[in-house]
Regions:
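C-terminal motif of bacterial Sec signal peptides marking the signal peptidase cleavage site
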Residues: 19-23
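Ligand-binding clefts/hinges and TM-proximal coupling segments of bilobed small-molecule sensing domains
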Residues: 26, 38-57, 61-64, 193-215, ...
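Extracytoplasmic small-molecule ligand-binding "clamshell" domains
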Residues: 32-137
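Bilobed "Venus flytrap"/periplasmic-binding protein-like clamshell domains
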Residues: 78-81, 90-106, 162-222, 240-242
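Short amphipathic alpha-helical coupling segments at ligand-binding clamshell hinges
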Residues: 95, 99, 179-182, 186, ...
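Acidic, polar ligand-binding/catalytic clefts
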Residues: 101, 105, 110-182, 263-267
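A ligand-binding cleft/hinge motif common to bilobed small-molecule-binding domains
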Residues: 120, 136-146, 199-207, 229-230, ...
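Periplasmic-binding protein-like
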Residues: 155-169, 240, 248-291, 310-315
């Protein structure tokens, strides 16, 4: 019954997403502009969704600039379905993009999305090209030292909210990799600065006493997938849902290894986070209140479910 209810909620949200309506303005305290987010209205219609009460009267820094300009500009690398990806018609979509739309609407401003390589999202925040970045980030100690990170948000069932991470390989290598130890000596691709880079380092390279494993970092997941297809590597480390989508689109060329990284090592860092420039506490505090409300209402689970369906990711 619980699964039926979730599928019903997801179906209702999907129907709402197909109606490209302009959202209502924020009911927050303080002086803000009415949020239209007209360019990205297709992402999410929030007009009938509950929103948290925010006091923005003492906004400072980037948050004040956002409110004054009426636009929240975010960076993303849209190669990480279902969180962020490009649809067949060329539009940016995904659960994190829906969340960003909801955040903008709660602030009463428009949303603007800048797409770029994953490594570029950090530079865009550093240089002030964007206000925030939403791009499938996990909590990492080195990130927390140089950026303001939001509270975590999860797209899975609250009873099993830890996301899984795995590796994919070619159909020719099917059955070759059955444990993490089997990847010792292999040539593995992972996206630079990603969580998967950390997982490979922590759980595969540490098993390699002779240094025979080659972890190669690439700028984009597309590079990794093309490399795997061309035989330049043996496997690619990915989020499990993203892995399923790439395998489904490979026309039988790739397979899931079904080998999972041990996520119990990182339980205290559960969930995905967004980031802003270090010191922008006014912005992060406001966004955290919004995300906490999203978690309370389980909105992100619904967004994630819809995005998975749109990305063609099957359970």
């Amino acid at each position: 019954m619980k699964d039926v209810m979730k599928k019903t909620i997801a179906a209702l949200m999907l129907a709402a997403l197909l109606i490209s309506l302009v959202s209502c303005g924020s009911s927050n305290k303080g002086e803000t502009k009415t949020g239209a987010t007209s360019s990205y209205a297709y992402l999410l219609d929030t007009s009938k969704m509950e929103k948290p009460e925010l006091d923005l009267s003492n906004a400072s820094g980037v948050l004040k600039s956002v409110l004054d300009s009426g636009v929240l500009t975010i960076a993303t690398s849209p190669d990480y379905p279902p969180a962020e990806f490009v649809t067949e018609d060329g539009t940016v979509y995904g659960s994190e993009m829906m969340l960003a739309k909801y955040v903008a609407d709660c602030l009463g401003v428009d949303l603007a999305i800048e797409t770029m390589e994953f490594s570029g999202t950090f530079a865009a925040v550093d240089t002030g090209k964007v206000d925030m970045a939403f791009s499938g980030y996990g909590w990492k100690a080195d990130r927390a030292e140089v950026y303001e990170l939001t509270v975590g948000f999860v797209g899975e069932d609250e009873e099993d909210s830890t996301s899984n991470h795995t590796l994919i390989t070619t159909v020719e290598n099917e059955g070759k990799f059955n444990t993490l130890a089997d990847f010792v000596g292999a040539h593995i691709y992972a996206q630079a600065a990603s969580l998967q880079e950390m997982y490979v380092e922590d759980q595969i390279l540490t098993l390699d006493t002779e240094g025979t494993t080659n972890l190669e970092l690439v700028s984009t997941l597309d590079q990794a997938i093309l490399g795997l297809q061309a035989g330049k590597c043996d496997a690619v480390a990915l989020d499990e849902d993203t892995a399923k989508q790439y395998v489904a689109q490979s026309a039988g060329k790739f397979v899931l290894t079904n080998v999972l990284f041990d996520m119990s090592l990182y339980e205290e860092y559960e969930g995905t986070v967004a980031l802003a420039k270090k010191g922008e506490t006014s912005l992060i505090e406001a966004v955290n209140k919004i995300i906490e409300f999203v978690n309370e209402k389980n909105y992100y689970f619904d967004m994630y479910s819809v995005a998975k369906e749109q990305a063609g990711i099957e359970e």
